[in-house]
Curated annotation (Swiss-Prot):
Any Pfam family: EF_TS
Function, in words: Associates with the EF-Tu.GDP complex and induces the exchange of GDP to GTP. It remains bound to the aminoacyl-tRNA.EF-Tu.GTP complex up to the GTP hydrolysis stage on the ribosome.
UniProt keyword annotations, A-Z: Cytoplasm, Elongation factor, Protein biosynthesis
Protein name: Elongation factor Ts
Organism of this sequence: Clostridium botulinum (strain Eklund 17B / Type B)
Length: 303
């Protein structure tokens, strides 16, 4: 006879459903340790079965060290917004961001083999979470920053839909440096720059843009002598759209980001330099399969 106490203990240890726990205990004649093994085996099988499903929902999470000198941003995907709001999923994503900040891993493959806790790797812990919550999940990507002189700052928008990580360098500690990092996070989240500066833009791409603008201007009947000026004007506009330092500050449309930083550098009494930034948007680039609900129900009923 399997006791309710044994079922409860097994549920607490594994997170599996009540009936699954009862079946596992029945199979193992009430041996909890063996039942844990059975559930792990079944959980792994369930996780493998789910791994083919599209995981385009989820969360972007960040973590900043106490000294504000390092930080990380991660994207953890699942299949539905329902699971993305689950407390266990959120806690896993938070823990993942913290681990990513201090890890020596440089790829997702290396990261998931890091220790999640004293008993499991990140991949093993994720597999257990997949088994408990019943959806495919993937650690999609992560980036970590660290700076000796300056700060690393992050911002999360829309409950984990968009995340930003920024590294700002300065030789002095000043509230102005923190303010720059904070405002840049907001700017990047809102304006979505693709590059830090004009120098980072691929020149082959610029030449292609110039040729497109040149042909457009000629097709509009513009005189050749002013076409080049028009092309350069459009290229400058392109820079202002895609380069962070060239963008107009979202809080003051009369001021560029570069001018804002220069003003804050005067307050700090030292140059402030933006070293790098990254912006994650949940699910970007993942093709989500839209299923017909009626067809899905019929499929599950075997019709």
């Amino acid at each position: 006879m399997i006791s309710a106490k044994s079922v409860k203990e097994l549920r607490e240890r594994t997170g599996a459903g009540m009936m699954d726990c009862k079946k596992a205990l029945t199979e193992t004649d009430g041996d909890i340790e063996k039942a844990v093994e059975v559930l792990r085996e079944k959980g792994l099988a369930a996780a493998a079965k789910k791994s083919g499903r599209v995981a385009a929902e989820g969360l972007v999470k960040t973590y900043i060290s106490e000294d504000k000198k390092s930080g990380a941003i991660v994207e953890l995907n699942c299949e539905t917004d329902f699971v993305a709001a689950n407390e266990d999923f959120i806690a896993f994503a938070d823990a993942l961001a913290k681990i990513a900040t201090s890890t020596s891993a440089t790829t997702v493959e290396e990261l998931v083999n890091e220790k999640f806790d004293s008993e499991a790797t990140i991949q093993e812990a994720l597999t257990g979470l997949i088994a408990r919550l019943g959806e495919n999940m993937t650690v999609r990507r992560f980036v970590k920053f660290a700076v000796d002189n300056g700060v690393v700052k992050s911002y999360i928008h829309g409950g984990g839909r968009i995340g930003v990580l920024v590294e700002v360098a300065c030789d002095v500690e000043s509230p102005a440096v923190e303010e720059v990092a904070k405002e840049l996070c907001m700017q990047i989240a809102a304006a979505n720059p693709l590059f830090l500066s004009k120098e980072e833009v691929d020149q082959d791409s610029i030449e292609k843009e110039k040729e497109i603008y040149r042909v457009q201007a000629l097709n509009e009947g513009k005189p050749e002598k002013i076409v080049e000026k028009m092309v350069m004007g459009r290229i400058q506009k392109y820079y202002k759209e895609v380069c962070l330092l060239e963008q107009l500050w979202v809080k003051d449309g009369d001021k560029t980001i570069t001018k804002f930083i220069d003003e804050k550098a005067k307050e700090a009494g030292s140059a402030i330099k933006v070293n790098r930034f990254v912006r994650f948007e949940r699910g970007e680039g993942i093709e989500k399969v839209e299923e017909n609900f009626a067809e899905e129900v019929a499929k599950q009923l075997g019709k």
